[in-house]
Amino acid sequence: MSAEDYHRAIAIERRTGQRLLKGRALSAGEIAAILSVCCQDSSVKGCRDAALIAVLYGAGVRRREVVALELDDWNSVDYCLTVRRGKGDKDRTTYLDDGAAAALLAWLAVRGEHKGTIFHPLRKGGRIEMRSISDQAVLDILLERGKEAQVASFSPHDFRRTFISNLLDAGADISTVQKLAGHASPVTTARYDRRGEAAKRKAVSLLHTPYSRESTDSKQ
């Protein structure tokens, strides 16, 4: 993807002036705070919520994709998940880092080895219901945990924006990030970039202008 195409993708204009991009990326501190309140909750719910949030962020999956994940989609050897029939009815493989994988494994140890979706709703007392968690339940969990962690308002899709922004910031090429995110075009991936001015400063810091006042004076 050329620099021209990239900047065209993120330059969204309106009739008068420039429109702010929707959504935001969460900071590392915010994600840590949300996961921390889950880990401090020693109940089954705390374990499940930590795993759910870790997968949303660590795998960059959409909300409807995370509720559809099944146990057979998890590869505990390679720490990867197969996202089936994502947007565009396409399958893809996405990988978890050690932290996200540890959170998921902790939940699976509680959940058990029965077939079906990975994430289930819970009854009072932490009893697992043998059905898929709903999209709305995921939203409710995030709102609850975000409020407990005193984190500014965010949406489930902001975890996906954060996933993409952080990978780009870490130096991953946009083509690879596109595949992990399940986008049809790198232009779409670029629109998820929420790194802002800090990314521009970081990029320019990689350059070196060979200017020296001393070398200039010596030539006079």
Where are these regions (language model features)?
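Conserved catalytic core of the tyrosine transesterase superfamily
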Residues: 1-220
